[in-house]
Regions:
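A nucleotide-sugar donor-handling region in carbohydrate enzymes
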Residues: 34, 67-70, 168-242
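Conserved nucleotide-sugar phosphate-binding/catalytic loop shared by glycosyltransferases and other
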Residues: 56-101
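Donor-nucleotide binding loops and adjacent catalytic segments primarily
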Residues: 67, 74-79, 209-301
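A donor-sugar binding/catalytic signature common to diverse glycosyltransferases
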Residues: 123-124, 131-134, 171, 291-335
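C-terminal amphipathic helix plus adjacent low-complexity
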Residues: 357-399
Length: 399
């Protein structure tokens, strides 16, 4: 593991299961995916696997929450992906402020690019790790692609997402609405590709595991359960403890059982952990992280999804699972008939949702695609016109 603030090589390549003919073709273009969390890896993995199978050389630069035991040491999941190189970088210590994490990540990724120069750097979303990689790629004149730009939310992270859009040379967005927002930021329509949300590719395919296997692996004792996730809102960190106490208090009062996926490491997380640690174990099963296929199977069979994760407003509607979005974290992110809304302190609304929606199933909502993002991503990268696009961008005025 590299020391904080300086990159040192720590790579592994596993090509045992990649077909020989694809490996011979893979000397053409090199792609580097940057991942800092379990969430963005769930979106990048199907894209990376499809690119590997199409003959591209694929590598991951792994940092952030992936490197921390408290959050499940999810770098292990990246290492499980065959046929790719994996490079690790420790970019933070517990309690580091976001600006320090950003600075350390810039230093580490800059050192990495001095030794490796991929043909394309791919980042996702709005995390500081993605922002650092986008900035370093831009200042080193390395082509970069931003996945799921043009989204809106209720947190300061939305600013980071829009920064990534301006730094990237190519954009792979989840919807026509997102494309319109990216164009409103002056980006060329020819560099924006609507592919849908990549994680739906996984949810649209068989998970490969049964619910019984998932429950056994993660020691989940109930077959009637909801999934609860409550992340910090960085601009509301002073109130996160009170919000978490009210939210989980309402869940506890319902008499239902819940699988609780632990929060990310944004500022305010410690107060949420303190609330979760006090929940009764006979009603709440706390899990730091899950393999994506196992989580997909768990969610398909859940009675409801509650909390402030994007899972509730994007993936749950696609699977037809009722969801309750709590607070401001996903404000204006998405709407669907199966998604309901409440403030963390609105116990009566939370109770009403659990009473009326628990166990219901809704028609699939395809506002973020049909589960074919990886195919569309590869099709764009196979077009030589993609690689001929100049790195120098021009601001495109609307109308």
């Amino acid at each position: 593991m590299a020391p904080i603030g300086r990159y040192q090589p720590a790579s592994r390549k596993n090509c045992k299961s990649a077909p020989r003919k694809l490996l011979l073709r893979a000397m053409t273009r090199s792609l580097l995916f940057v991942t800092g969390t379990r969430a963005d890896f769930g979106k990048l993995e199907p894209l990376a696997a499809a690119c590997r199978d199409a003959g591209f050389r694929v590598a991951f630069w792994v940092t952030g929450m992936h490197m921390q035991d408290r959050y499940g040491l999810t770098k292990i999941e990246v290492h499980r992906l065959p046929g790719v190189e994996v490079h690790e970088y420790l970019n933070q210590r517990p309690g580091d402020p976001q600006d320090a994490v950003l600075a350390k990540t810039v230093l580490g990724f800059s050192d990495f690019l001095a030794e490796h120069r991929p043909d394309l750097v791919i980042v996702h979303g709005d995390r500081v790790e993605a922002l650092a990689a986008s900035l370093v790629a831009a200042t080193n004149y390395v082509r970069s692609a931003h996945v799921e730009g043009g989204e809106v939310s209720g947190t300061i992270d939305e600013v980071f997402r829009h920064c990534n859009t301006k730094l990237a040379t190519h954009h792979f967005v989840s919807s026509k609405a997102a494309k319109a927002r990216v164009m409103a930021m002056g980006e060329d329509a020819g560099a924006i590709h609507v592919i849908g949300s990549p994680e739906l590719d996984v949810h649209g395919a068989p998970s490969g595991v049964t619910l019984a296997e998932v429950r056994a692996r993660y020691a989940i004792p109930w077959d009637d359960y909801g999934i609860a996730t409550f992340h910090p809102v960085t601009s509301e960190q002073a109130t996160m403890g009170a919000q978490a106490a009210a939210f989980f208090g309402a869940l506890q009062a319902s008499g239902r059982h819940f699988v609780v996926i632990l929060p990310n490491n944004d500022p305010g997380a410690e107060a949420i952990f303190q609330v979760i640690d006090r929940l009764p174990e006979d009603r709440f099963r706390r899990i730091p992280s899950m393999r994506f296929a196992h989580f997909s199977e768990l969610m398909r069979n859940a009675a409801a999804v509650v909390g402030n994760s994007s899972t509730g407003v994007r993936e749950a509607p696609w699977l037809g699972v009722p969801s309750l979005d709590i607070g401001t974290r996903q404000t204006n992110r998405a709407t669907a008939p199966s998604v309901h809304y409440a403030d963390a302190h609105e116990g009566e609304r939370i109770t009403a949702f659990l009473a009326t929606e628990w166990g219901r199933r809704h028609p699939r909502h395809a506002g973020f695609g049909e589960g074919r993002a990886a195919d569309r991503f590869v099709a764009v990268l196979r077009d030589e016109g993609f690689w001929d696009r100049p790195l120098q961008k021009a601001f495109r005025d609307l109308g």
